[in-house]
């Protein structure tokens, strides 16, 4: 039976992924949600915690897939780079700024980076997420209807309100969809 682990985005909680978990369960997947305090630690630290979470789970008998929303997708990039053997299925990211985040850079340039972004900026939102290891399948879904902080931060172009569509691509990506 296929398994999926869901990761939330910045300033969210694992429960934010519960409606998506219900939909996946209805399609026959077993689903877990992984929660992490997005601004308290760095992405490599979150990836290490995800590895401990995966090691304590019972995921034998089928591929292990991952879905990450926004920052959760960057945690998955760090996880896949450090533990490629643990990714037996695919990674799908939803609105993840794979090549850095202009919104995060604008927040940081206003002097609000530490209180609002914490450890999430370095190694990820700054565009320094690790490359995908060979053999890891990653697909990205981007939004194109602006809702959120984008206008206040002066984002222009196709975006979901926080992440520009162009930021949701990365080298080695298998597929990219814009909704």
Regions found by a protein language model. Give the residues of each.
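Serine-dependent carboxylesterase/thioesterase catalytic core
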Residues: 4-10, 15, 19, 23-38, ...
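C-terminal catalytic-base region of ester-bond hydrolases, centering on the histidine
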Residues: 133-179
